Amino acid sequence: MTANFSTHVFSPQHCGCDRLTSIDDVRQCLTEYIYWSSYAYRNRQCAGQLYSTLLSFRDDAESVFIDVRELVKNMPWDDVKDCVEIIRCYIPDEQKTIREISAIIGLCAYAATYWGGEDHPTSNSLNALFVMLKMLNYVDYNIIFRRMN
């Protein structure tokens, strides 16, 4: 009997970075980060300083959404529109605070990790990415750029 081990480690462009050099990189970096969060820990590259900062956004998710684990478990991640509406119950304003922006990223990263696959994302973890992209706009990316650096 032989063991079958996967040697693939997901390693996105910004994972090992310490900071971003341009506001134009924020959306791509966040997309990679949520995608990276969808992989099992052993199948993704270790986080650099930039991703460590993004991981800290889960604390903001706890402060805004209170019980993040229960919320993530109970949200209908198979329906992006419904998830966006649920988040808007907590964060109704179009103009969000830095904590609210961070909380959205943290919630979606938590969902991507919770619903993620062993060696590839699942449809629910990818929907967490789509929810984040629906919730954030260029102004939000500009605000969060300062916190990421």
UniProtKB/Swiss-Prot annotation:
**Which is one Pfam family of this protein?**
Poxv_Bcl-2-like
InterPro entries associated with the record: Poxvirus_B14/B22/C16, Poxvirus_Bcl-2-like, Poxvirus_sf
**GO BP term (any one):** symbiont-mediated suppression of host NF-kappaB cascade
Q: Which residues form a coiled coil?
A: none
Q: Which domain of life is it from?
A: Viruses
**Keyword Glycoprotein listed:** no
Q: Which Gene3D superfamilies match?
A: dsDNA poxvirus
Here the disulfide bonds are none
Any keyword Cell division? no
Keywords on record: Early protein, Host-virus interaction, Inhibition of host NF-kappa-B by virus
Report the family membership. Answer: Belongs to the orthopoxvirus OPG200 family.
Quaternary structure (record): Homodimers. Interacts with host IKBKB; this interaction inhibits host NF-kappa-B activation.
Q: What does it do?
A: Contributes to virulence by binding to the host IKBKB subunit of the IKK complex and preventing host NF-kappa-B activation in response to pro-inflammatory stimuli such as TNF-alpha or IL1B. Mechanistically, sterically hinders the direct contact between the kinase domains of IKBKB in the IKK complex containing IKBKB, CHUK/IKKA and NEMO.
Spell out the protein name for this chain.
Protein OPG200
Species of the source: Variola virus (isolate Human/India/Ind3/1967)
The encoding gene is OPG200
